[in-house]
Amino acid sequence: MLNSLDLEGRPEDTRVVVAMSGGVDSSVTAALLKSEGYDVVGITLQLYDHGAATHRKGACCAGQDIHDARNVAERLGIPHYVLDYEDRFRESVIDNFAASYASGETPVPCIECNRAIKFGDLLKTARELGASVLATGHYVASRRLADGSRALVCAADADRDQSYFLFATTREQLDYLRFPLGDMTKPEVRELARRFGLEVADKHDSQDICFVPTGRYTDIIGKLRPNAMEPGEIVDLNGRVLGAHQGIANYTIGQRKGLGIAAGAPLYVVKLDVATRRVVVGPREALRTHRITLREVNWIGDGVLDAAVRDGLELFVRVRSTRPPQPAWLRGADGQYEVELVAGEEGVSPGQACVFYDAASGRARVLGGGFIQSAVAESRTTAGLVRPQRVAEPVRG
Protein backbone atom coordinates (compact mmCIF):
# COMPACT_ATOMS: atom_id res chain seq x y z
CA MET A 1 0.00 0.00 0.00
CA LEU A 2 1.48 3.35 -1.08
CA ASN A 3 1.08 6.49 0.99
CA SER A 4 0.30 9.95 -0.41
CA LEU A 5 3.94 10.38 -1.45
CA ASP A 6 3.93 7.17 -3.50
CA LEU A 7 6.07 5.44 -0.91
CA GLU A 8 5.71 2.15 0.92
CA GLY A 9 4.94 2.47 4.60
CA ARG A 10 2.90 4.57 6.98
CA PRO A 11 3.37 8.35 7.00
CA GLU A 12 4.51 8.30 10.62
CA ASP A 13 7.33 5.96 9.62
CA THR A 14 8.38 8.16 6.69
CA ARG A 15 10.78 11.04 7.18
CA VAL A 16 10.43 13.95 4.76
CA VAL A 17 12.80 16.90 4.50
CA VAL A 18 11.02 20.06 3.32
CA ALA A 19 12.99 22.88 1.72
CA MET A 20 11.56 25.88 3.59
CA SER A 21 12.24 29.28 2.04
CA GLY A 22 9.99 31.19 4.43
CA GLY A 23 7.34 31.78 1.80
CA VAL A 24 3.74 30.61 1.77
CA ASP A 25 4.32 27.76 -0.70
CA SER A 26 7.03 25.87 1.17
CA SER A 27 5.30 26.62 4.49
CA VAL A 28 2.06 25.03 3.29
CA THR A 29 4.04 22.08 1.94
CA ALA A 30 5.47 21.46 5.40
CA ALA A 31 2.07 21.96 7.06
CA LEU A 32 0.31 19.57 4.68
CA LEU A 33 2.82 16.80 5.22
CA LYS A 34 2.80 17.32 8.98
CA SER A 35 -1.02 17.15 9.01
CA GLU A 36 -0.86 13.83 7.15
CA GLY A 37 1.35 12.38 9.86
CA TYR A 38 4.76 12.41 8.20
CA ASP A 39 7.98 12.87 10.16
CA VAL A 40 8.79 16.33 8.76
CA VAL A 41 12.12 18.12 9.05
CA GLY A 42 12.43 21.67 7.73
CA ILE A 43 15.66 23.00 6.24
CA THR A 44 16.33 26.58 5.18
CA LEU A 45 19.42 27.47 3.20
CA GLN A 46 21.20 30.74 3.91
CA LEU A 47 22.49 31.50 0.45
CA TYR A 48 23.91 35.02 0.55
CA ASP A 49 24.54 38.07 2.73
CA HIS A 50 21.04 39.04 3.75
CA GLY A 51 21.80 42.46 5.21
CA ALA A 52 20.58 44.68 2.40
CA ALA A 53 17.52 42.58 1.63
CA THR A 54 16.35 41.71 5.12
CA HIS A 55 13.04 43.56 5.07
CA ARG A 56 12.59 44.32 1.39
CA LYS A 57 9.32 43.08 -0.12
CA GLY A 58 9.61 40.83 -3.14
CA ALA A 59 13.04 39.44 -2.27
CA CYS A 60 13.40 35.69 -2.13
CA CYS A 61 15.41 34.02 0.64
CA ALA A 62 16.09 37.26 2.51
CA GLY A 63 16.88 37.43 6.24
CA GLN A 64 13.21 37.92 7.08
CA ASP A 65 12.46 34.69 5.23
CA ILE A 66 14.69 32.69 7.57
CA HIS A 67 12.83 34.21 10.50
CA ASP A 68 9.47 33.33 8.90
CA ALA A 69 10.54 29.76 8.17
CA ARG A 70 11.65 29.30 11.76
CA ASN A 71 8.32 30.63 13.06
CA VAL A 72 6.35 28.29 10.80
CA ALA A 73 8.42 25.32 11.95
CA GLU A 74 7.81 26.24 15.59
CA ARG A 75 4.07 26.49 14.98
CA LEU A 76 4.03 23.10 13.27
CA GLY A 77 6.24 21.54 15.93
CA ILE A 78 8.85 20.25 13.52
CA PRO A 79 12.65 20.37 13.69
CA HIS A 80 14.14 23.21 11.65
CA TYR A 81 17.72 23.78 10.58
CA VAL A 82 19.39 26.71 8.84
CA LEU A 83 22.40 25.69 6.76
CA ASP A 84 25.05 28.16 5.64
CA TYR A 85 25.52 27.71 1.89
CA GLU A 86 26.85 31.18 1.09
CA ASP A 87 30.21 30.04 -0.29
CA ARG A 88 28.69 27.26 -2.38
CA PHE A 89 25.95 29.57 -3.70
CA ARG A 90 28.46 32.24 -4.62
CA GLU A 91 30.62 29.77 -6.53
CA SER A 92 27.82 27.88 -8.30
CA VAL A 93 25.26 30.61 -8.93
CA ILE A 94 26.47 34.18 -8.45
CA ASP A 95 29.87 33.78 -10.13
CA ASN A 96 28.31 31.91 -13.05
CA PHE A 97 25.62 34.58 -13.33
CA ALA A 98 28.20 37.35 -13.69
CA ALA A 99 30.38 35.32 -16.06
CA SER A 100 27.39 34.56 -18.27
CA TYR A 101 26.48 38.23 -18.62
CA ALA A 102 30.11 39.08 -19.31
CA SER A 103 30.00 36.55 -22.16
CA GLY A 104 27.02 38.28 -23.76
CA GLU A 105 24.42 35.86 -22.44
CA THR A 106 21.22 36.36 -20.44
CA PRO A 107 21.35 33.70 -17.70
CA VAL A 108 18.58 32.20 -15.57
CA PRO A 109 20.16 31.84 -12.10
CA CYS A 110 17.14 30.04 -10.62
CA ILE A 111 17.83 27.06 -12.88
CA GLU A 112 21.41 26.74 -11.65
CA CYS A 113 20.28 27.17 -8.05
CA ASN A 114 17.78 24.34 -8.41
CA ARG A 115 20.28 22.13 -10.21
CA ALA A 116 23.36 22.64 -8.06
CA ILE A 117 22.07 23.72 -4.66
CA LYS A 118 18.50 22.61 -3.97
CA PHE A 119 18.43 19.37 -5.96
CA GLY A 120 22.13 18.73 -5.57
CA ASP A 121 23.51 19.66 -2.17
CA LEU A 122 20.22 19.85 -0.26
CA LEU A 123 19.05 16.52 -1.64
CA LYS A 124 22.29 14.95 -0.43
CA THR A 125 21.73 16.47 3.02
CA ALA A 126 18.19 15.08 3.10
CA ARG A 127 19.53 11.59 2.43
CA GLU A 128 22.09 11.99 5.20
CA LEU A 129 19.26 12.89 7.59
CA GLY A 130 17.53 9.62 6.75
CA ALA A 131 14.72 11.18 4.74
CA SER A 132 12.84 9.06 2.22
CA VAL A 133 12.15 12.10 0.03
CA LEU A 134 12.83 15.82 -0.32
CA ALA A 135 9.68 17.92 -0.75
CA THR A 136 9.53 21.47 -2.10
CA GLY A 137 6.88 24.11 -2.71
CA HIS A 138 7.45 24.33 -6.46
CA TYR A 139 4.43 24.53 -8.74
CA VAL A 140 5.16 21.41 -10.72
CA ALA A 141 4.24 17.75 -10.30
CA SER A 142 5.72 14.31 -10.75
CA ARG A 143 3.93 11.14 -11.79
CA ARG A 144 4.86 7.49 -11.38
CA LEU A 145 5.44 5.77 -14.72
CA ALA A 146 4.74 2.13 -15.55
CA ASP A 147 8.38 1.18 -14.96
CA GLY A 148 8.36 2.75 -11.49
CA SER A 149 10.35 5.84 -12.44
CA ARG A 150 8.86 9.30 -12.26
CA ALA A 151 7.97 11.91 -14.87
CA LEU A 152 8.00 15.68 -14.38
CA VAL A 153 4.76 17.35 -15.46
CA CYS A 154 3.40 20.89 -15.53
CA ALA A 155 1.44 22.25 -12.59
CA ALA A 156 -2.34 22.49 -12.52
CA ASP A 157 -2.00 26.26 -12.08
CA ALA A 158 -0.64 27.26 -15.48
CA ASP A 159 0.00 30.82 -14.30
CA ARG A 160 2.31 29.53 -11.55
CA ASP A 161 3.90 26.61 -13.38
CA GLN A 162 7.65 26.43 -12.68
CA SER A 163 8.57 23.53 -14.94
CA TYR A 164 10.78 25.79 -17.08
CA PHE A 165 13.14 26.27 -14.13
CA LEU A 166 13.35 22.55 -13.32
CA PHE A 167 14.27 21.09 -16.71
CA ALA A 168 17.78 20.21 -15.49
CA THR A 169 16.42 17.83 -12.84
CA THR A 170 17.78 14.34 -13.43
CA ARG A 171 15.87 11.06 -13.38
CA GLU A 172 17.63 10.04 -10.17
CA GLN A 173 16.69 13.31 -8.50
CA LEU A 174 13.07 13.01 -9.66
CA ASP A 175 12.76 9.65 -7.93
CA TYR A 176 13.65 11.36 -4.64
CA LEU A 177 11.68 14.60 -5.07
CA ARG A 178 8.05 15.34 -4.29
CA PHE A 179 5.98 18.43 -5.15
CA PRO A 180 2.79 18.42 -3.03
CA LEU A 181 1.46 21.70 -4.52
CA GLY A 182 1.53 20.55 -8.13
CA ASP A 183 -2.21 19.92 -8.28
CA MET A 184 -3.21 23.13 -6.49
CA THR A 185 -3.74 26.75 -7.46
CA LYS A 186 -2.14 29.66 -5.65
CA PRO A 187 -5.45 30.83 -4.11
CA GLU A 188 -5.99 27.31 -2.77
CA VAL A 189 -2.52 27.32 -1.23
CA ARG A 190 -3.11 30.66 0.48
CA GLU A 191 -6.44 29.41 1.83
CA LEU A 192 -4.71 26.35 3.26
CA ALA A 193 -2.15 28.62 4.91
CA ARG A 194 -4.98 30.47 6.63
CA ARG A 195 -6.57 27.22 7.78
CA PHE A 196 -3.25 26.11 9.23
CA GLY A 197 -2.93 29.48 10.96
CA LEU A 198 0.31 30.42 9.24
CA GLU A 199 1.35 34.06 9.47
CA VAL A 200 2.80 33.90 5.95
CA ALA A 201 -0.62 33.27 4.37
CA ASP A 202 -0.68 36.71 2.73
CA LYS A 203 3.06 37.17 2.32
CA HIS A 204 4.15 38.65 -1.01
CA ASP A 205 5.61 36.29 -3.58
CA SER A 206 9.30 36.62 -4.41
CA GLN A 207 9.78 38.57 -7.64
CA ASP A 208 13.44 39.43 -7.93
CA ILE A 209 16.73 37.63 -8.29
CA CYS A 210 17.34 36.79 -4.64
CA PHE A 211 20.98 37.91 -4.47
CA VAL A 212 20.34 41.31 -6.09
CA PRO A 213 18.83 43.26 -3.16
CA THR A 214 18.70 46.57 -5.05
CA GLY A 215 17.09 45.07 -8.14
CA ARG A 216 20.08 46.30 -10.21
CA TYR A 217 21.82 43.15 -11.38
CA THR A 218 24.55 45.24 -13.05
CA ASP A 219 25.86 46.12 -9.57
CA ILE A 220 26.80 42.47 -9.07
CA ILE A 221 28.25 42.10 -12.56
CA GLY A 222 30.27 45.30 -12.30
CA LYS A 223 31.85 44.08 -9.08
CA LEU A 224 32.65 40.54 -10.23
CA ARG A 225 33.24 41.13 -13.97
CA PRO A 226 34.18 44.82 -14.43
CA ASN A 227 35.10 44.18 -18.07
CA ALA A 228 31.40 43.64 -18.79
CA MET A 229 30.78 47.28 -17.84
CA GLU A 230 33.41 48.79 -20.14
CA PRO A 231 32.06 51.30 -22.69
CA GLY A 232 31.77 50.49 -26.38
CA GLU A 233 29.93 51.25 -29.60
CA ILE A 234 26.35 50.67 -30.64
CA VAL A 235 26.30 49.79 -34.35
CA ASP A 236 23.75 48.73 -36.96
CA LEU A 237 23.84 45.48 -38.95
CA ASN A 238 26.25 47.07 -41.43
CA GLY A 239 28.67 48.18 -38.73
CA ARG A 240 27.74 51.87 -38.86
CA VAL A 241 28.25 53.53 -35.47
CA LEU A 242 24.98 54.87 -34.04
CA GLY A 243 25.99 55.65 -30.49
CA ALA A 244 27.84 54.46 -27.40
CA HIS A 245 27.03 52.22 -24.44
CA GLN A 246 28.34 51.84 -20.90
CA GLY A 247 28.76 48.08 -20.78
CA ILE A 248 27.47 45.04 -22.65
CA ALA A 249 25.98 43.67 -19.44
CA ASN A 250 23.32 46.40 -19.64
CA TYR A 251 21.80 44.76 -22.73
CA THR A 252 20.07 41.58 -23.79
CA ILE A 253 18.88 40.21 -27.12
CA GLY A 254 15.54 41.73 -28.11
CA GLN A 255 15.93 44.83 -25.93
CA ARG A 256 14.44 48.04 -27.33
CA LYS A 257 14.27 50.46 -24.42
CA GLY A 258 17.30 52.23 -23.01
CA LEU A 259 19.42 52.22 -26.17
CA GLY A 260 19.83 55.99 -26.10
CA ILE A 261 19.96 56.39 -29.87
CA ALA A 262 17.67 58.22 -32.26
CA ALA A 263 16.44 56.38 -35.35
CA GLY A 264 13.63 56.70 -37.84
CA ALA A 265 12.30 53.24 -36.96
CA PRO A 266 12.40 51.13 -33.79
CA LEU A 267 15.69 49.31 -33.25
CA TYR A 268 16.37 46.22 -31.15
CA VAL A 269 19.48 44.56 -29.79
CA VAL A 270 20.23 41.64 -32.13
CA LYS A 271 23.80 40.75 -31.15
CA LEU A 272 26.31 41.29 -28.35
CA ASP A 273 29.90 41.12 -29.61
CA VAL A 274 32.01 40.65 -26.51
CA ALA A 275 35.33 40.64 -28.38
CA THR A 276 34.79 44.14 -29.80
CA ARG A 277 32.47 45.36 -27.02
CA ARG A 278 29.88 46.21 -29.66
CA VAL A 279 26.12 46.17 -29.23
CA VAL A 280 24.56 45.44 -32.63
CA VAL A 281 21.04 46.72 -33.27
CA GLY A 282 18.58 46.18 -36.09
CA PRO A 283 14.90 46.07 -37.06
CA ARG A 284 12.49 43.71 -35.35
CA GLU A 285 12.56 41.21 -38.21
CA ALA A 286 16.27 40.70 -37.57
CA LEU A 287 15.30 39.00 -34.31
CA ARG A 288 13.34 36.25 -36.02
CA THR A 289 14.78 32.83 -35.24
CA HIS A 290 13.94 29.39 -36.61
CA ARG A 291 17.00 27.44 -35.49
CA ILE A 292 18.88 27.32 -32.20
CA THR A 293 21.76 25.21 -30.92
CA LEU A 294 21.91 23.91 -27.36
CA ARG A 295 24.49 22.99 -24.74
CA GLU A 296 24.24 20.99 -21.52
CA VAL A 297 21.15 19.12 -22.69
CA ASN A 298 19.33 17.10 -20.02
CA TRP A 299 16.92 14.36 -21.12
CA ILE A 300 14.20 12.98 -18.82
CA GLY A 301 11.91 11.64 -21.52
CA ASP A 302 11.58 7.96 -22.40
CA GLY A 303 14.62 5.99 -23.49
CA VAL A 304 18.00 7.38 -24.51
CA LEU A 305 18.22 10.88 -25.98
CA ASP A 306 20.26 10.06 -29.08
CA ALA A 307 17.96 7.20 -30.00
CA ALA A 308 14.88 9.37 -29.47
CA VAL A 309 16.10 12.17 -31.74
CA ARG A 310 18.02 10.15 -34.33
CA ASP A 311 15.42 10.81 -37.05
CA GLY A 312 14.21 14.07 -35.51
CA LEU A 313 11.76 14.26 -32.63
CA GLU A 314 8.61 16.35 -32.89
CA LEU A 315 7.84 18.09 -29.61
CA PHE A 316 7.08 21.48 -28.08
CA VAL A 317 9.61 23.91 -26.63
CA ARG A 318 9.59 26.96 -24.43
CA VAL A 319 12.48 29.37 -25.04
CA ARG A 320 11.58 31.79 -22.26
CA SER A 321 9.71 31.28 -19.00
CA THR A 322 7.02 33.81 -19.94
CA ARG A 323 6.28 32.31 -23.36
CA PRO A 324 4.07 29.31 -24.13
CA PRO A 325 5.48 26.12 -25.65
CA GLN A 326 5.52 26.04 -29.44
CA PRO A 327 5.96 23.24 -32.02
CA ALA A 328 9.54 22.28 -32.79
CA TRP A 329 11.86 19.51 -33.94
CA LEU A 330 14.83 18.27 -31.92
CA ARG A 331 17.80 16.73 -33.75
CA GLY A 332 21.39 15.83 -32.97
CA ALA A 333 23.71 13.33 -31.33
CA ASP A 334 26.79 13.02 -29.13
CA GLY A 335 26.20 16.22 -27.20
CA GLN A 336 25.45 18.37 -30.26
CA TYR A 337 21.76 19.22 -30.47
CA GLU A 338 19.71 21.64 -32.51
CA VAL A 339 16.10 22.78 -32.29
CA GLU A 340 14.09 23.88 -35.29
CA LEU A 341 11.23 26.22 -34.32
CA VAL A 342 8.35 25.52 -36.69
CA ALA A 343 6.76 28.96 -36.39
CA GLY A 344 9.91 30.84 -35.45
CA GLU A 345 10.50 33.05 -32.44
CA GLU A 346 11.78 36.56 -31.73
CA GLY A 347 14.44 37.64 -29.28
CA VAL A 348 15.92 34.24 -28.46
CA SER A 349 18.90 34.90 -26.21
CA PRO A 350 21.95 32.71 -25.47
CA GLY A 351 22.03 31.69 -21.82
CA GLN A 352 18.28 31.23 -21.59
CA ALA A 353 16.81 27.73 -21.42
CA CYS A 354 15.03 25.82 -24.15
CA VAL A 355 12.72 23.37 -22.39
CA PHE A 356 11.12 20.34 -24.08
CA TYR A 357 7.48 19.30 -23.56
CA ASP A 358 5.29 16.56 -25.00
CA ALA A 359 2.30 18.91 -25.39
CA ALA A 360 1.65 22.61 -25.88
CA SER A 361 -0.63 23.07 -22.88
CA GLY A 362 -2.32 21.38 -19.95
CA ARG A 363 -0.48 18.91 -17.76
CA ALA A 364 2.29 18.42 -20.30
CA ARG A 365 5.25 16.21 -19.46
CA VAL A 366 8.67 17.82 -19.31
CA LEU A 367 11.09 15.89 -21.52
CA GLY A 368 14.20 17.86 -20.58
CA GLY A 369 15.93 20.82 -22.15
CA GLY A 370 19.20 22.66 -22.59
CA PHE A 371 20.78 26.09 -22.50
CA ILE A 372 20.68 28.13 -25.68
CA GLN A 373 24.14 28.37 -27.21
CA SER A 374 23.30 30.32 -30.36
CA ALA A 375 20.44 31.31 -32.62
CA VAL A 376 20.25 31.95 -36.35
CA ALA A 377 18.01 34.93 -37.04
CA GLU A 378 16.55 35.94 -40.39
CA SER A 379 16.79 39.54 -41.52
CA ARG A 380 14.25 40.42 -44.20
CA THR A 381 15.44 43.23 -46.47
CA THR A 382 13.20 45.84 -47.98
CA ALA A 383 13.37 43.90 -51.26
CA GLY A 384 11.75 40.95 -49.52
CA LEU A 385 14.85 38.77 -49.53
CA VAL A 386 15.76 36.73 -46.48
CA ARG A 387 19.37 36.98 -45.36
CA PRO A 388 20.27 34.34 -42.76
CA GLN A 389 22.90 35.48 -40.31
CA ARG A 390 24.08 34.32 -36.93
CA VAL A 391 23.21 37.35 -34.86
CA ALA A 392 22.43 36.02 -31.42
CA GLU A 393 25.56 34.03 -30.63
CA PRO A 394 27.84 35.95 -28.25
CA VAL A 395 31.38 36.39 -29.53
CA ARG A 396 33.81 35.69 -26.72
CA GLY A 397 37.15 37.36 -26.50
From Swiss-Prot:
Q: Which residues bind ATP per the record?
A: 19-26, 45, 137
Cellular location(s): Cytoplasm
Residues of the active site: 113 (nucleophile), 210 (cysteine persulfide intermediate)
Q: Enumerate the UniProt keywords alphabetically.
A: ATP-binding, Cytoplasm, Disulfide bond, Nucleotide-binding, RNA-binding, Transferase, tRNA processing, tRNA-binding
Q: What is its main location?
A: cytoplasm
Q: Which reactions are catalysed by this chain?
A: S-sulfanyl-L-cysteinyl-[protein] + uridine(34) in tRNA + AH2 + ATP = 2-thiouridine(34) in tRNA + L-cysteinyl-[protein] + A + AMP + diphosphate + H(+)
- E.C. designation(s): 2.8.1.13
In the record, biological process GO terms are:
tRNA wobble position uridine thiolation
Stretches of the chain forming a coiled coil according to its record: none
Q: Where are the transmembrane segments?
A: none
Q: Which GO terms describe its cellular component?
A: cytoplasm
Where does the record place the site Interaction with tRNA?
138, 352
Q: Which GO terms describe its molecular function?
A: ATP binding; tRNA binding; tRNA-uridine 2-sulfurtransferase activity
Query: Region Interaction with tRNA: start and end of each range?
Result: 160-162
User: What S-S linkages are listed for this chain?
Assistant: 113-210
**Enzyme class (EC, first level):** transferase
Please give the InterPro entries that the UniProt record associates with this protein: MnmA-like, MnmA-like_C, MnmA-like_central, MnmA-like_central_sf, Rossmann-like_a/b/a_fold
Similarity section? Belongs to the MnmA/TRMU family.
Primary role: Catalyzes the 2-thiolation of uridine at the wobble position (U34) of tRNA, leading to the formation of s(2)U34.
Protein name according to UniProt = tRNA-specific 2-thiouridylase MnmA
Organism whose genome encodes this protein = Bradyrhizobium sp. (strain BTAi1 / ATCC BAA-1182)
